[in-house]
Amino acid sequence: MAITAQMVKELREKTGAGMMDCKKALTETNGDMEKAIDFLREKGIAKAAKKADRIAAEGLTFIETNGNDALILELNSETDFVAKNEGFQTLIKELAAHLLTNKPANVEEAMAQTMENGKKVEEHINEAIAKIGEKLTLRRFEIVSKTDADAFGAYLHMGGRIGVLTVLEGSTDEAAAKDVAMHIAAVNPKYIDRDAVTAEEVEHERQVLTQQALNEGKPEKIVAKMVEGRLGKFFEEICLLDQAFVKNPDMKVRQFVESKGGTLKGFVRYAVGEGIEKREDNFAEEVMNQVKGSN
C-alpha cells in the first residue's frame, strides 16, 4: 500500500524515530502501524510506543464522593475557555451528584434519567448547551464502592485535566490513597500489577525483546537471560505496584501502600479527551476546494 506523509508523521510521534527509519518500517510492514512499531523496536531504533492517545478534546474530569461511594466522570466541551465557564462548572457538579445518587449503568441510561428538577439529564445538558453556546458531552463515568475499613483517594490535576480515583483496601488513610492517585496521574500506569497483564501481551513483548537482542548480535545462550531482565523493566513501566514511587523514588508503590497497612484494590484514571481526535482540516486544501467548486 502507499505510505503517506501522515502515516510517517504518526509513526514518528509514537516512536520518536527518524523520518527515513519510519518510512522504511512502514514500507517493510506494508503500512501496518503496530508491526512498524515492532520493526523499529527490534532494530533498536525506537522504544516501546507509549499508549497515551493524542488528547484533542477539551473539558474536565470531576470526582464526587459520598460515604462509601465515589464517582469519576468526564464532561467534554469544544474549547478550554468554556471548560472554565461557571455554567460548565455548575453542570459538571450537578451531573456528578445525580449520577452518584442514582447509579445508572452507563451514559445511555443516565441520559434518560430524570433529575431533581424534573428534567431528563439529556434535556438538562441541552439547556446548558443553549446557554453556553458550545456542544457539551457527558463522555463517561465510573462509580466505585468501598467499605468503612477502606479509603478513597481523589486527585484532580490541573483543575481536572486529569482525574484519578483510587481505593485503598484495609486502610482508612485518605492522604496515602491520594498520594497514590497523584503518582498515577503523573506516571499513567496501565495495570495494577503483573497479574493483570495478559499472557499474550507478555509473550508479544518477549518476542520483540528477543529479536532486539539477537539483532544486537548477542550470543543466543545469554539472550534468554537478557530478555527476562528487560521484561522486568517492561513491567516497571506499565505496572503501578512495580513502579518507583514518585514522592519517594527509593521505594516501590507496593512498599508505600504496604507501609500504610493496606492494599490497592483498584484505580480509575481519566485524561480529558484521551482517544478523541479533533478533525484537522488542511486550510490550503480547503481554499483550493472552494476555488475549484466556484469554477
Swiss-Prot record:
Record CDD domains: UBA_EF-Ts
Gene3D superfamilies listed in its UniProt record: 1.10.286.20, DNA helicase RuvA subunit, C-terminal domain (1.10.8.10), Elongation factor Ts, dimerisation domain (3.30.479.20)
Annotated GO CC locations: cytoplasm
Keyword field: Cytoplasm, Elongation factor, Protein biosynthesis
Highest taxon of the lineage: Bacteria
Compartments reported by the entry: Cytoplasm
Example of a GO MF term: translation elongation factor activity
Region (Involved in Mg(2+) ion dislocation from EF-Tu): 79-82
One GO term of the biological process aspect: translational elongation
Major location (coarse): cytoplasm
InterPro entries hit by this protein: EF-Ts_dimer_sf, Transl_elong_EFTs/EF1B, Transl_elong_EFTs/EF1B_dimer, Transl_elong_Ts_CS, UBA-like_sf
Job of this protein: Associates with the EF-Tu.GDP complex and induces the exchange of GDP to GTP. It remains bound to the aminoacyl-tRNA.EF-Tu.GTP complex up to the GTP hydrolysis stage on the ribosome.
HAMAP family the record matches: EF_Ts (MF_00050)
PANTHER family, A to Z: ELONGATION FACTOR TS, ELONGATION FACTOR TS, MITOCHONDRIAL
Family label: Belongs to the EF-Ts family.
Name of protein: Elongation factor Ts
Record organism: Bacillus cereus (strain ATCC 14579 / DSM 31 / CCUG 7414 / JCM 2152 / NBRC 15305 / NCIMB 9373 / NCTC 2599 / NRRL B-3711)
Gene name linked to the record: tsf
